[in-house]
Amino acid sequence: MKKDPASKLRKVMNPSLGKTQTKQLGNWLVKAVLLVLILSATACGQQRQTESRSQPNSAAAADSQKRLVLESATINQPNQQGQTQWKINAKRAVYSPDQKTAQLEDITGNLYQDGKVVLQVDAKRGTVKKDGKEIVLRDQFVATDPRNGATIRGENVVWRPQQDLLLVRQNFTGSHPKLTASANQGKYDTSKQRLELIGQVEATAQDPSLHMKTEHLFWKIQQGLVISDRTTHIDRYKGETITDSAVADHAQVNLNTQIAQLNQNVELKSLDPLLQIATESATWNPEAQTVVSDKPVRIVNSEEKVTATANQGQVNLDTKVAHLTGGVQGISKRNQAQLFANKLFWKIPSPRMQAKGNVIYRQADPPLNTTGTQAKGNLANENIVVRGGDSDERVVTEIVP
């Protein structure tokens, strides 16, 4: 016979039960209710954690599904006037969900100005950023300017079409029929056709054969000018041999005229003849082997130990002749002989000189002081002839006791 469920309830609620039993039964019910509540809360928390962990994965999957992938893609970017600013062909293009960036593979592209191609680029990989305002190019990067034939290579390249600027942040190299160059970094302004080279710059001109070293260099390709505003070393080669070398704080080489303009702390050395020229400004023609200065100049022949200074001067390293004008002074360190004049003709490497205008000759042994209008002779061995010039001009000789 089935028991009535209500009878159990009546037993629990039976007032005939003892107080102790009633109290124990109440405690048991409270604990049971608390246990049920704790288990329910834990289950809910675990469910929420599971849901929260699954949400990012779901979002990532959704983002992945939103990415646009194009094969054999062509991307165009117009300027404000609607003209094509740049065009890129890529074997594969993967766009971000917001369509603001794209990852590219096997890239070829063109940069346009006024409807004409001014730069052709190639790279294995790249990224279009900032709605096409910046393009990063990597791996086997090459850029060519069809207007002048210059080719640029490097790593970690940033192309900013709106600024007409190409930045090569590592291992820059540039080549042109007239010049090759390398540097740590490089910048190319396509509107001005100007390269800026930064850090450990080396440049080699083909004709004449010149090798330049500096820390900062501008290469104006269209004008054929190479300009440095830092200390610059230039070596002239004949075959594999250095024939002349120069150093200056500022230098400009014209690749068209083959002339170098050197300024500030200029020092030029020649091996044949063995000569050193120091001045603040000099025009050096390596091909013609001439050096011209309109500033105070100092010429030293270390072989004969003869030094000449003047307000201006020019030296022909080919014919081995120096012409000095204005406040000329020649000194032989061997015997302390001195020759002063307005003009001086010096046949190098010998110490033979011809002087004109307000000539003064001095020697120490034997002591002698002679003045006149002209002088000729060998300064190193004190064999100098001083003349008065016209018949009414006298030579004054003072013998110092």
Language model features by range: what are they?
Residues 1-401:
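Mature-chain termini and adjacent capping regions
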